[in-house]
Amino acid sequence: MMTLTTDKKTMNITEIQSLLPHRYPFLLIDRVTDYEEGKYLIGLKNVSVNEPQFTGHFPQLPVFPGVLILEAMAQATGLLAFKTFGAPKENELYYFASIDEAKFRKPVTPGDQLMIEVEFLKERRGIALFNGVAKVDGDVVCSAQLKCARREF
C-alpha cells in the first residue's frame, strides 16, 4: 500500500513530454498529481470521446480499450523510473518489459478520469518491478504488475 506524502510533487504535460517519447495520440498521461522518487507516482488521464480509438471501439457504446489502460500504467512506470533512477543516457530508453496479473474490473468510458497509481517494488540488473492500479471515481478498474527495463538502443 502506498504512503502518500503531504508535500506533493507534480508534473505538467511539458515535463511529461520531456521525459517520455510518446506523442498524440499515444501519450496517455495528461498530468502527474503526486510522486515520490523510489516509491510511487499518481498520474491522470482524461478520457475524451474525441480520441481516435472510439471510432472503432465501439461506435454504439464507446469503451476505452483495456490495453490503453495498461499502456497508461506503463507510461506512469516510465515516469517514476526517470524520477527514481535518473534520465537514461542519450542512447538509452526505459522499455516496457512485461505485464503480469492484469485484471479488468469495470469499463472506462468517455468523460471518465483515470487515476493511474504505480508503486515501485524493486530493481535488479536494470529491470524494475512495479504494481499498478487504475481507478475511476475511486473504484479500481484495472490492476497489474509491470516491469520496465533500462536498455541501450
UniProtKB/Swiss-Prot annotation:
Enzyme Commission identifier(s): 4.2.1.59
Localization per record: Cytoplasm
NCBIfam families: fabZ, PRK00006.1
Keyword set, alphabetical order: Cytoplasm, Lipid A biosynthesis, Lipid biosynthesis, Lipid metabolism, Lyase
Lineage: Bacteria, Pseudomonadati, Pseudomonadota, Gammaproteobacteria, Vibrionales
GO biological process entries: fatty acid biosynthetic process; lipid A biosynthetic process
Family in the record: Belongs to the thioester dehydratase family. FabZ subfamily.
Assigned GO CC terms: cytoplasm; membrane
Listed name of the protein: 3-hydroxyacyl-[acyl-carrier-protein] dehydratase FabZ
A GO molecular-function descriptor: (3R)-hydroxyacyl-[acyl-carrier-protein] dehydratase activity
Reaction equations catalysed: a (3R)-hydroxyacyl-[ACP] = a (2E)-enoyl-[ACP] + H2O
Record carries keyword Lyase: yes
InterPro entries: FabA_FabZ, FabZ, HotDog_dom_sf
Domain of life of the native organism: Bacteria
Catalytic site: H57
Purpose: Involved in unsaturated fatty acids biosynthesis. Catalyzes the dehydration of short chain beta-hydroxyacyl-ACPs and long chain saturated and unsaturated beta-hydroxyacyl-ACPs.
Source organism per UniProt: Vibrio cholerae serotype O1 (strain ATCC 39541 / Classical Ogawa 395 / O395)
Pfam families reported in the protein's UniProt record: FabA (PF07977)
Broadest EC class assigned to this enzyme: lyase
Nuclease is among the record's keywords: no
